[in-house]
Amino acid sequence: MNEKASRIHIAIVDDDALVRESLCDCVESAGYSAEGFASAEEFLASNSGGNAACLVLDIACLILDIQLPGVSGLELQRRLSDGAPPPVVFVTANATDANRESALKHGAKGFLAKPVRCQELLNAVRAAIPS
């Protein structure tokens, strides 16, 4: 396990339990710690909501799906951008040009289409996390 990675916490928001588990397993295989959330609301409620959740959970990177029940991944990204959000990497089956443009315009550091290979995800996470 990479000692530096073991101190880095990744949050994953995806409503598909199998995908969420697979993404968690992938980042954990590289030594990161991971926590999965089934919705944006669950993530926001995890610790007072908003950027408070990011600070309290000490999140270094947020992996988001776009299509979520209730608040979408793009909307969650916008809500978090009011403060000092962690870097965001989108992993989505809805990888349209419009979604990509919107995500990147609002500061996403990565945008990957499902299905995503583990190495591709890890490359995006590593590129997103500041050194």
Regions found by a protein language model. Give the residues of each.
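C-terminal output helix
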Residues: 98, 116-125
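Active-site beta3 strand of CheY-like receiver
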Residues: 50-63, 68
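Alpha4 helix (beta4-alpha4-beta5 surface) of REC/receiver domains from two-component response regulators
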Residues: 75, 95-110
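The feature encodes the CheY-like receiver
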Residues: 20, 57, 69, 96, ...
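Short amphipathic alpha-helix used as the core "switch/output" element in two-component signaling
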Residues: 72-84
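Acidic catalytic/metal-coordinating carboxylates
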Residues: 38-39, 58-60, 72-75
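Two-component/phosphorelay signaling modules centered on CheY-like receiver
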Residues: 17-35
